[in-house]
Amino acid sequence: MFWTWFCFPFPWILYAIDPSKFSSWTQCINQTVENYGNIGSLLAGLTAIASVLLLYETLREQQKSNQHNEFESRYFKLLEANRKTADQMKWTAPDGNEYHGSQVFQIMLELIENSYKTLTTRDLPSESPVPCLPWQGVSVEQKHFINIAYKVVFWGLDTRGKSILEKSDANDLISSESIRMLDARMGTSTTGIRLENGGFHAYTGHYFRMLYQSIRYVNEQDSLTYRQKYEYVKMLRAQLSNMETAVLFYDSLSDLGADWELSWQGANSNINKQLITKYNLIGNLPDGMVPRKLVKKFYPNMKFSDEPMTEERCKLKKMYA
């Protein structure tokens, strides 16, 4: 109240003393008010711009969150579907015995190993030279015998399986004569199962396609760091039994599973598509299940869970995306 009564007569007193000073004083006030008005307009504009930027950032973060939630939702569905496919797998042997889940992979692994041993004890014909292999310590015959052993078990040695193997253009060691020799030598395994049945393609083909697509889906997520991708793939890897992991190893060495890594070695080298090594997909495999020396021949930079980190592996981790 005091300041109201004090300030109210002040302009009039100033006008009575010197009208020119009163005019200057009013002009100063008007200029000040005008300046504050300009500043207010500027601040209002800046506030509006800040609001738009804040809204944009909020929407962008919300979009990222939605995309991440969508990725996780789809990935966990793939995990569930892949596990269900493995658990519900059923294979009926020619003698009528049924094998379920991991038992199917156990039988398949035994047949692959028996087939490989059979192949290495025979001289299979080759009609044309085979190009040199990029893996140190791996002979041409060893790689091709692994490929044949897996494909024979996958397709089987029934009429259709033999036809597929004979028409294969990915391996010139496979010929009609070779198939006849395999058919004669590959008798029964210790479980009494013969290879004249239709093979395992109807049971494991879908499983391995789904497994590959699940890991590839994670690998292609540009919004994730390599560390984040590794943790997601680690969830899937933890679901695999030792038998599944061992069969996966042989699958990755065959023509059928070359996209796991071998297709991206050598001339077409792309470390970010070499999924076996990048995500240590067979790193939990016990040494007695598959010879570790054999694994290291094809995947020298893959780290087993009980091994220390090598210098080369550390370099790769920094390069992975």
PLM ranges: what are they?
Residues 12-31, 64-321:
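Amphipathic alpha-helical "stem/stalk" segments
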